[in-house]
Amino acid sequence: GNNKENVIEVKHLNKSFGTHEVLKDIDFSVEKGEVVCIIGSSGSGKSTLLRCINLLEIPSGGEIIYNGENILDEKHDIYKYRTKLGMVFQQFNLFNNHNVLGNCTVGQIKVLKRSKQEAEEVAMKYLKIVGMEQFINAKPKQLSGGQKQRVAIARALSMEPDVILFDEPTSALDPEMVGEVLKVMKELADSGLTMLVVTHEMGFAKLLYGF
């Protein structure tokens, strides 16, 4: 497609830690409404790639083009860019001191400056989508791994980002919980959400692409 449709374009991305080259000359793009799966074994640099895209790690070379601009340019507003990227981590990274609703509103209120009422309405919309609306008063420690990850997905959705990055979203889950998270991800993919998924699981790719 033409460049307007690319949400993120990675060009010649390199990342080294000392003399150890983890990423070498990586090129790919994520189009609006597309789901890109990066599949590889643990330790193959997949998570490093995501950490470079959301600038938790600074790439050693190359470009990350977002809306036509290289966000690695010094003048770029990294903070603003980061708010446009949703992130779902392997370990959920929920705020343990907040209940489920609070987890899904705190970023909206602090970063997007939404009112508490608006933030709660948005959060409820996405908690319903992931099937967690009846747990709004629960603390993370009261939830199963699958429930925590569904809350983490709702939290990312509540920021209404341009793309959501998923870093091994099912690898910390007990096998019987993987299905409920994949089901939510499949529904989101079918709804036209732009997603970049790093996983060592063929299961999600099979579900998504139907092979």
Annotate each predicted stretch with a short phrase.
Residues 71-86, 116:
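ABC ATPase NBD coupling module
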Residues 70, 105, 116-135, 183:
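Conserved ABC ATPase "signature" region
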Residues 62-73:
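Conserved ABC transporter NBD signature motif
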